[in-house]
């Protein structure tokens, strides 16, 4: 999966990310982990790769990382932000 780049703009503020979809008028804010995952999704990534990266970056257990990645990906899909 990969972030849909057309008509998206974002700004990082104090470690959080604000994403604006100019096409669909979608406004999304993320925490630091969401900002980290969003940046990874500028290139094609699997959920497993995102999970592994989250574990390495934040030193959390696999179950927590999988749950967080699943929730974040679901949110991006709901907002039609994935290519």
Give short role names for the model-derived ranges.
Residues 13, 26-83:
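Long, charge-rich, low-complexity alpha-helical segments
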Residues 1-22:
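Long, low-complexity, charged/polar intrinsically disordered regions in eukaryotic proteins
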């Amino acid at each position: 999966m990969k972030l849909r780049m057309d008509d998206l703009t974002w700004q990082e503020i104090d470690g959080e990310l604000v994403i604006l979809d100019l096409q669909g008028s979608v406004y999304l804010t993320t925490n630091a982990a969401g900002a980290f995952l969003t940046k990874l999704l500028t290139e094609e990534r699997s959920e497993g790769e995102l999970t592994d990266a989250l574990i390495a970056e934040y030193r959390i257990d696999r179950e927590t990382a999988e749950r967080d990645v699943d929730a974040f990906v679901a949110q991006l899909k709901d907002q039609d932000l994935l290519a």
